[in-house]
Amino acid sequence: MVDALASGASIRKDVEVRVLSWAPFSSGGIRMMEEKPVTIHLYKNDLPDGLTLGPIVAIDCETMGLNPHRDRLCLVQMSDGDGNAHLVQIEKGQSAAPNLSRLLEDPDTLKLFHFGRFDIAAMYNAFGALAAPVFCTKIASKLVRTYTDRHGLKNLCQEMLNIDISKQQQSSDWGAPDLSEAQKTYAASDVMYLHQLRDLFIERLAREGRAEIAQACFDFLPIRARLDLAGWPEIDIFAH
C-alpha cells in the first residue's frame, strides 16, 4: 500500500481483486482455473510522491478513442510485476503529470509496452514526455512468432503463459469520473503479465538470432510515435 500522497495527486482507493487465469496441471494438458490476487491502487492526476516501481515498469494507456489528436488520454496503468497495479486517472485538459513524466523519461527505467507505439504517442501528446528506453512485446512477437498473424496481448498470454485475460472492457467510457470494478480489473490485467512475456521473448529473440534487430526497433519506437503525431501515421518514410 502507498503511504504518501503526491502533491497534486490523490489516492482514490486501493482494492484487491482476483484475476482469473488458466494454468495447466503439472501432469499434462488439462487446464485448471487459478486465482491470482492483484492489488489495484487508483490515483488522480499523477503518481504519488515517493512511489518507486523498480527498474522495469509495465505501462499501458486507455483513451477515449484511437485518434491521438481527437481522443484524450484517460488512464495510465503501471506495474513492476509484483502483483500491484497502479492506475492514474487523467482529467480532461490535464497537460502535466510530473512524477509520471519523470518515470517515462528516466534513462535507468525500462518501460514495457504491448503496442507501445500507441501508448508512447498518447502520453507524449498529453504531457510532452517521451518514454525511453522501451521494450514492446508486440514487436517482439512479430519478430519471433512468424508462424501466426495473431499478436494481440490476449493471444500472447494464452499461448505463452496459459493465461486467459478478458478484453470485454476494451471499448468502454474511460473518461468516466468513476471507473467500474470491471474497468479497473481490465486495466490491471493489461500490465500484470508483460514482465513474464518479456523474459520469454528475450529467450526466443536470442534463439532466433534477432535480439539485435529487436533492440534497434525498440530504440526507434519513440521516434516512430513522434512521426505518427507529426503527420506520418500510415506512411513508411523508408519506402521508395
Regions picked out by a protein language model, each given a short descriptive name:
Residues M1-A4, V17:
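Short, positively charged low-complexity motifs
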Residues S7-S10, S21, S26-S27:
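Serine residues within intrinsically disordered or low-complexity segments
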Residues P24-C74, M78-H240:
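DEDD superfamily 3′-5′ metal-dependent exonuclease/proofreading module
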